[in-house]
Amino acid sequence: MPQSVNGHANGGDLERIAVKVGQKIHVILVTDIMYIQSDGDYVQIMTDQHNYIKEETMKYFETNLPADRFVRVHRSYIVNVEKILRIELYEKQSQMLTLKNGDKIRASASGYKALRTVLNL
């Protein structure tokens, strides 16, 4: 069974995330998330359609998102493995992930190791 970076075999079972934007609350399905990026005391949740900002920690998402689908590939990024198009060598100790929407994310050596485990590489 794949291990996430946090050591939990299955990770969490979070299915949706509520984000308040002004007077509205948007409900995001985790399957729609491309990646999550840390931004100080907040995180940016990137989907195909929109980018959302939420006051939450990366550790919270790392623990609560499904570990077979989401991997922390860098201290600043958690990626949905189903949204990865390509993985390429970037520098000696890192890889560059190209997502289906064209965004590029650098994976650290430990993040790439965790990604390889989830992808069975």
Residue map of PLM features:
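Short, basic/aromatic-enriched C-terminal tail that caps enzymatic domains
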Residues: 110-121
